[in-house]
Amino acid sequence: MTHRFAPTAALLVLAAFSTSVPAQTVLQTDALEQGQVLDDTQLAEAPGRAGRISLVQGKVDIGGDIGAESSPAQLNWPITSRNLISTAPGARTELRIGSTAIRLDGDSSLEVTELDDDSLRLRLHYGSVSVRVMNVDVVPEFELRTAQATVRLTQPGRLRVDAERERDTSLVSVLDGEAQVDGAGASLTVRGGRAAQVRDEDVRTLQAQRDNFDDWSLTRDQALVAAQSSRHIGTEMTGYEELDRYGSWSTSSDYGSLWTPQVAADWTPYRDGSWTFIAPWGWTWVDNAPWGYAPFHYGRWVQVRNRWAWAPGRLERRPVWSPALVGWVGGSNWNVGFQSHNLAAHGWYPLSPYDRYVPGYRLSSERLRRLNDWRHATRREQQQPGRYNGLTVVPREQFGGRGPVIVPRAPRPNRPEQLVSGTPGSAPPPPLVARPGWNRDRRDLLERANVGQTGVERPAFERPGLERPTLERPAL
């Protein structure tokens, strides 16, 4: 198939394709025409919700579908459907999806089978996971499966699930709240302080126990209380919990709530991180700062007294996620001096509240309206062509390979002060095309992954030679 690109304006953002995995293998497909907005009834819309890797301790890997190549997990990496996260013995990791915290202990493998606006479904292949759900709206969306059991919450709470720590056994411990556990032909309600041990043909209840993994998870919850941020942006904006520790809040008559990060005076948004191609959105920003998730996937950036501040916009129950809120400029017909050579270049700049976000992926008109609905941004017009505050420029060839575009390592223009006029609009190209037949292989993998819906047997996740110890946890 071929790519079809329409003419683009300077505010064009992120051309997206249908399939990608974190290992940077990308399937070539027909592209959506840039700026096209789909009717609400069309089903190809990208999710408006994504998670985040918020902590990595030790060796943690993340991959796409089962059988796809994995790569080391990275802080602030977006989490979406069919991601597979695995930890080595002694390692731990944490995922955040709004106010929901998901933590994996060492020697564990967790698959995000479905994550979108209406569902949060997980599958624990082996190991131990701790889940804290604090928002009542998330309760009906949540489901966790193992080989022996299906777990659903009936109220907000905290639970711990162990799979294959004992062979062919799942242990569901409800530490707070209440859960429904289905398995071995039985269905039972498990309340706080109790646990259900499920084998293929046997279910029994017992007292829940705790160990240092549970204590560590509770300590993380207590340390990540963000009272100020929750008042300004709510708790369902993924990454909110980091902001109180790394910046300060204020209120502006022009922009509403503003958050100012603790950074150097010459700091600029979207300059310390990398671009990675993630389906279905396309080029996605992964920031290096520990707080660098919410301010780069929601809201806008403004300059106040020559310093950058983040404006999250109106308070919403669950805001719409974006891969990056930037405008793109440059392309093959725009040459810039880098050291001793003139090279074709691409650049990007943070959108202000007065700039319109135009996605390059499928998005409904209702979500696009929410992304561009700024009640405070009524006094000025959008940035005029050639006036791109915070513009960052790198050689176009940086976007041509399979790997991510690591911005701090990329060459910079010789005369950046001259890059303020005459820059055409153009989004960067997708990465290299995957090998022929990859789409068919991927479809087979997806069918095996959807065992709960298709009935196809899922491949085993046993690893020969590794004996899993029996849990010994003190009673609550």
Regions picked out by a protein language model, each given a short descriptive name:
Residues A10-L11, V21:
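Cleavable N-terminal signal peptides
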Residues F5, V26, D30, Q36-L38, ...:
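Compositionally biased, intrinsically disordered low-complexity segments enriched
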Residues R199-A265, P269-L476:
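Low-complexity, repeat-rich tail regions
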Residues M1-T2, P22, V26, L32-Q34, ...:
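Intrinsically disordered, low-complexity regions enriched for glutamine and histidine
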Residues M1-A9:
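Bacterial N-terminal signal peptides that target proteins for export
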Residues Q24-Q180, G185-S187, G192-A196, A226-S230:
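Flexible, surface-exposed loop/linker segments and immediately adjacent secondary-structure boundaries
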